[in-house]
Amino acid sequence: SLSDKDKAAVRALWSKIGKSSDAIGNDALSRMIVVYPQTKIYFSHWPDVTPGSPNIKAHGKKVMGGIALAVSKIDDLKTGLMELSEQHAYKLRVDPSNFKILNHCILVVISTMFPKEFTPEAHVSLDKFLSGVALALAERYR
């Protein structure tokens, strides 16, 4: 679970990188579909699933909107992300193992876009936070 120190580190990092969340989302989703091509199955209804396509950009923005919501609900991710959990479990039917894949891509992108801000301490806290987000999103799968 997240300590107060972790929560403070995530909030501090987000305050520095949040304004770039659309670019982070686009890059992370683009990276995911290239490195983990099996994830494209969830986007087969899109006309263009290439990295940086309008659909990828739009969904990357949505994903990072969810991350922003999670930052604001950091004290109770399970309750705060219940609607998103229900949507992913019942409507979108996303295999929850994919949350971990996307989390890894988000970490990679943030580390390359913000090397100064992405200290080892920020890395640990953000990794724990994203793991908590994945767990909260998987809640409705049980």
UniProtKB/Swiss-Prot annotation:
Q: Any keyword Glycoprotein?
A: no
Q: Looking at the UniProt record for this protein, which Gene Ontology cellular component terms does it annotate, in alphabetical order?
A: blood microparticle; haptoglobin-hemoglobin complex; hemoglobin complex
PROSITE patterns from the UniProt entry: GLOBIN
Please name the CDD domains in this protein's record: Hb-alpha-like
Its tissue distribution reads:
Red blood cells.
Enumerate the residues binding O2: 59
Say yes or no: keyword Lipid metabolism present.
no
Question: Sites of the modification N-acetylserine?
Answer: 1
Limits of the Globin domain = 1-142
> Which keywords annotate this record?
Acetylation, Heme, Iron, Metal-binding, Oxygen transport, Transport
Binding annotation for heme b: 88
Question: Pfam families, per this entry?
Answer: Globin
Mention one GO molecular function: iron ion binding
What Gene Ontology terms for biological process does this UniProt record contain?
hydrogen peroxide catabolic process
Recorded hits in SUPFAM superfamilies, A to Z, give: Globin-like
Signal peptide range equals none
- On the tree of life, the source organism's domain of life is Eukaryota
Query: Which function does this protein serve?
Result: Involved in oxygen transport from gills to the various peripheral tissues.
The family annotation for this protein states:
Belongs to the globin family.
Give the note. This fish has three hemoglobins: Hb1 (major, about 65-70% of the total), Hb2 (about 5% of the total) and HbC (about 20-25% of the total). Hb1 and Hb2 display a very weak Bohr effect and no Root effect.
Quaternary structure note:
Hb1 is a heterotetramer of two alpha-1 chains and two beta chains. HbC is a heterotetramer of two alpha-1 chains and two beta-C chains.
- For this entry, the protein name equals Hemoglobin subunit alpha-1
Give the species.
Answer: Trematomus newnesi
